[in-house]
């Protein structure tokens, strides 16, 4: 929601389609992180055709879908979140975005293995795939680039999760809390569950 607020300030109207949260939940979260959201239009629906009808009347400059697993196309087979539904809704979203020349953000769930849930085809249809990963011991979030058609894939973004939302970490050294036990002979090494970074 913070990203959508920043985009709305720069671009104009953005549409936030949420099948995950109700408008009341989104409003509460927005107020908690200090977002007025005057140019953010919220639609709590999973009906892909209804979403595009509203988009036609609003003419948003950006659309965020949260999440692809909650969308449903009545002309497609399968239950909401099924491979067919994810594939067909993904096609419709991408075709709509191309026809209107607007960027879209599609959030999705990951499997226990850490892969994008749904058909692998979805990853091939989009320009960029990002993973937001949590940390077990700190309130840090890492945004990793898994695919980037227009730039490098070796980039990460570091964020601190707080009551007021995500805050960018510009200097990791200053953000790591070692409980004040910095002394001679101590070494701080960045590792992820035993793997070398």
Q: What does each model-identified segment do?
A:
Residues 84-109, 125-136:
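Substrate-engagement module of ASCE P-loop NTPases
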Residues 30, 115-125:
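Short regulatory helix/loop adjacent to the ATP-binding pocket of P-loop NTPases
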Residues 7, 55, 97, 122-123:
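A generic structural signal for well-ordered alpha-helical segments
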Residues 65-70, 79, 97, 104-106, ...:
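Long C-terminal interaction/binding lobes of large macromolecular proteins
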Residues 44-46, 108, 170:
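Short loop/edge segments at beta-strand edges and connector loops
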Residues 11-12, 38, 101-102, 124-128, ...:
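Short glycine-/polar-rich loops that comprise or flank the Walker A/P-loop
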Residues 36, 56-62, 69-71, 134-197:
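Conserved P-loop NTPase
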Residues 2-92:
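Conserved inter-motif catalytic segment of the P-loop NTP-binding fold
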């Amino acid at each position: 929601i913070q990203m959508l607020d920043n985009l709305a300030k720069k671009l104009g109207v953005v549409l936030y389609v949420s099948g995950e949260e109700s408008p009341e939940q989104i409003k509460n979260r927005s107020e908690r992180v200090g977002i007025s959201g005057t140019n953010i239009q919220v639609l709590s629906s999973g009906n892909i055709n209804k979403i595009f009808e509203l988009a036609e009347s609003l003419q948003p400059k950006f659309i965020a879908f949260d999440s692809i697993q909650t969308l449903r196309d009545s002309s497609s087979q399968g239950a909401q979140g099924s491979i067919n539904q994810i594939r067909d809704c993904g096609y419709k979203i991408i075709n709509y975005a191309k026809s209107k020349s607007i960027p879209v953000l599609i959030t999705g769930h990951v499997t226990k293995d850490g892969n994008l849930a749904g058909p692998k085809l979805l990853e091939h249809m989009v320009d960029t795939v990002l993973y937001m990963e949590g940390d077990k011991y700190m309130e840090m979030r890492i945004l990793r680039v898994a695919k980037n058609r227009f730039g490098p894939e070796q980039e990460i973004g570091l964020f601190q999760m707080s009551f007021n939302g995500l805050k960018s970490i510009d200097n990791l050294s200053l953000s790591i809390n070692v409980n004040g036990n910095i002394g001679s002979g101590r070494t701080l090494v960045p590792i992820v569950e035993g793997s070398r970074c």
